[in-house]
């Protein structure tokens, strides 16, 4: 019984269990540290504005990709490693980006039409396209999760946390609230770029999704 348990633990460790556990702890520490630094850098008024804008963004993100991410997790797991799986991811990436571009215009219009303070209103315009970059990152992560690339999944999550929190702190220090969101874009672009370099070998980013789906049907 004990030997079976040891073997099971070793198998899980080889599949990246310890990487995922370690990355989770590491990311929480980085996020917590970043929040403490952010409170010290920004004034009470600036932090209040940042929290307000961030909360509204989180509300809009309830419509993130219109469920594409959850769908890819489900169908990707069913058709793992098949041409159809790659086609689903390509199709989902396109649809998710289109949905979030529409969402981006909604966020921008909300800021321009319903936020009276002009300095706060412009922040909604600045953050409006963050969901577009966010869903690309999330789909890349789901892809790794489906294929059980647990080690890269963990490293990629940590990379995103470090870049975003680092960008947040640096942006806040030099440019205030606007800098936070501006550097968030830079961090997300860097993370997406790293993901594309790794995922290029899979070929799904470049395949014709409609042709593959039609053939499989």
Regions inferred by a protein language model and the residue ranges of each:
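Interfacial/gating helices of multi-pass transporter permease domains
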Residues: 35-59, 182, 215-217
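N-terminal membrane topogenesis motif
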Residues: 1-30, 84, 213-217
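Membrane-interface junctions at transmembrane-helix termini in multi-pass inner-membrane proteins
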Residues: 84, 133-156
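C-terminal transmembrane helix end/exit motif
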Residues: 72, 139-146, 150, 170-173, ...
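Small-residue-rich midsections of specific transmembrane alpha-helices
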Residues: 24, 30-35, 51-77, 131-136
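Alpha-helical transmembrane segments of multi-pass membrane proteins
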Residues: 59-63, 97, 101, 105, ...
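Transmembrane-helix boundary and interhelical linker motifs in polytopic inner-membrane proteins
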Residues: 6-11, 42-46, 60-94, 145-151
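Hydrophobic alpha-helical transmembrane segments
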Residues: 120-128, 154-202
């Amino acid at each position: 019984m004990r030997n079976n348990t040891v073997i099971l633990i070793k198998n899980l460790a080889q599949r990246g269990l310890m990487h995922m556990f370690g990355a989770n702890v590491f990311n929480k520490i980085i996020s917590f540290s970043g929040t403490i630094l952010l409170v010290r850098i920004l004034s009470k008024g600036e932090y209040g504005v940042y929290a307000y804008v961030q909360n509204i963004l989180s509300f809009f993100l309830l419509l993130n990709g219109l469920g594409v991410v959850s769908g890819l997790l489900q169908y990707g797991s069913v058709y793992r490693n098949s041409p159809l799986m790659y086609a689903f991811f390509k199709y989902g990436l396109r649809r998710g980006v289109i949905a979030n571009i529409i969402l981006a215009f909604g966020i921008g219009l909300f800021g321009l039409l319903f936020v009276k303070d002009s300095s706060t209103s412009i922040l909604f315009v600045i953050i409006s396209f963050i969901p577009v970059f966010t869903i690309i990152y999330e789909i890349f992560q789901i892809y790794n999760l489906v294929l059980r690339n647990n080690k890269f999944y963990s490293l990629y999550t940590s990379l995103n946390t470090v870049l975003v929190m680092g960008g947040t702190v640096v942006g806040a220090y030099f440019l205030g609230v606007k800098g936070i969101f501006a550097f968030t874009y830079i961090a997300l672009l860097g993370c997406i770029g790293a993901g594309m370099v790794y995922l290029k070998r899979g070929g799904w980013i470049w395949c014709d999704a409609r042709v593959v789906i039609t053939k499989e049907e």
